[in-house]
Amino acid sequence: EKGFPYYPTDTKWRNDIFNQLVNFKRDTLIDRKNKVIGQSAHGLNLAWSYMPHAWGIKCGKMKTPMEIWEDEEHLSKGLNKILSGTFFMKKPAHMITESDMRSMLRRYSGTQMVSNFRPTAAAAMYDIFVDKESPLEGTTAGTVWDPSMGYGGRLLGAIAAGVNYIGTDPCIPTYEGLEKIRDEYGHKHLN
């Protein structure tokens, strides 16, 4: 009825998610003693909102979420799993959200979706390993080079951490999404 449950693309939603990412306390993810950077999903949905084509990208021989969506039998089985509470939290039909649908399409048996780097983890790594702009310390923002940018997680992490980011990606629809992220949230280079 509504069409595929892509992530929202409206400016207010995106700006709210971006602000949550920027304001997230990344230092809570860093466990220096055990040399571990923890996980938080902040900003991941923002990255995905620029990559609608990702739902149809094949991972080996697995079905894509888009293939499940387009197959009435599989889609019906997935919906029944939500309605009955099998594998998913049980919900009546009128309570099923687009988020529930995305989750089901990702986790449906025999299905795999491409993955993304968590922006908070990327930003935490940049916080540790890359210089920041600081007139007080006399430093300028360092630069990260990403030879295979993926779906925007590391780019958003670089923006949140305030470091320069240079990247390449061979997939045209992916690169177009990355350019939109850069144009809408990236810092303008001053030189």
Regions found by a protein language model. Give the residues of each.
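Class I S-adenosyl-L-methionine-dependent methyltransferase catalytic core
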Residues: 1-43, 52, 59-191
